[in-house]
């Protein structure tokens, strides 16, 4: 049972705004502070924020009335990155399907690694896998426990990073890539938005990785006795995670002061 102090409205309000905006900043421990119902609300809020307000509102309108007003169609088309109003229903379907496919694949990929970490506790493993799957793809930094990201476990860290990276690209880019793959469109004919997003994203990740490894390779506080694989693993996490996903990197205080790592 939560005490009166623990249930302060400011904590609930702050967490709600953080979840809906998918910024992932939490002033309380999401696992110990909130009840099971509260954690479900947190997951749903992040999912709504990840899909987008207009996307979610359009889904409700379609479910209730099977049609949308012209203004709502224009706003939804703008959010989804399409210029054809008659494509909105199909694009919405693709967006929802893509979201749940990626999150389901992430959940299944995370389960074996988390199962080993949790020593065979299926219920706890399923809860953590679901939490990480939703949070990573929607680029929210909430974690299901106080330990933060399992950066030392590739079986857990890699699916989270891959899902977060896909979520970072955004629906318009993912939709364009899927269409190009279906029609076997060569990269030179991809949309300008897709090209700019991919080039910029990969450039930032590669530059961040190179800079982190260059500066931190001999850091005794972070890599004392570590092998090359461990150094690369930390470097990849440091390059991918802070850009958008917002997951806590508990080892950040050990890096050198001239290489700050902060989320966008």
PLM regions with names:
Residues 1-264:
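Membrane-proximal intracellular helices of multi-pass ion channels
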């Amino acid at each position: 049972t939560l005490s009166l102090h623990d249930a302060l409205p400011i904590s609930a309000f702050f967490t709600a705004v953080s979840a809906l905006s998918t910024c992932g900043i939490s002033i309380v421990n999401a696992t110990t502070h909130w009840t099971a119902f509260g954690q479900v609300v947190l997951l749903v809020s992040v999912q709504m924020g990840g899909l987008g307000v207009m996307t979610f509102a359009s889904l409700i309108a379609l479910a209730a009335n099977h049609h949308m007003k012209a203004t709502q169609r224009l706003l939804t088309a703008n959010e989804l990155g399409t210029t054809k109003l008659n494509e909105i229903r199909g694009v919405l379907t693709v967006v929802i399907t893509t979201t749940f496919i990626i999150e389901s694949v992430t959940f299944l990929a995370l389960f074996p690694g988390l199962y080993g970490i949790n020593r065979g506790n299926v219920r706890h493993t399923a809860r953590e896998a679901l939490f990480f799957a939703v949070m990573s793809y929607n680029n929210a930094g909430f974690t299901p426990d106080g330990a933060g990201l399992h950066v030392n476990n590739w079986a857990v860290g890699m699916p989270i990073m891959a899902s977060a990276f896909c979520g970072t690209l955004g629906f318009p880019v993912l939709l364009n890539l899927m269409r190009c793959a279906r029609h076997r469109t060569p990269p030179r004919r991809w949309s300008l938005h897709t090209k700019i997003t991919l080039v910029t994203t990969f450039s930032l990740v590669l530059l961040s990785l190179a800079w982190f490894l260059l500066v931190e390779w001999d850091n005794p506080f972070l890599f004392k006795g570590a092998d090359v694989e461990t150094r690369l693993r930390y470097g990849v996490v440091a390059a991918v995670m802070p850009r958008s996903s917002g997951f806590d990197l508990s080892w950040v205080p050990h890096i050198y002061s001239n290489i700050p790592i902060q989320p966008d």
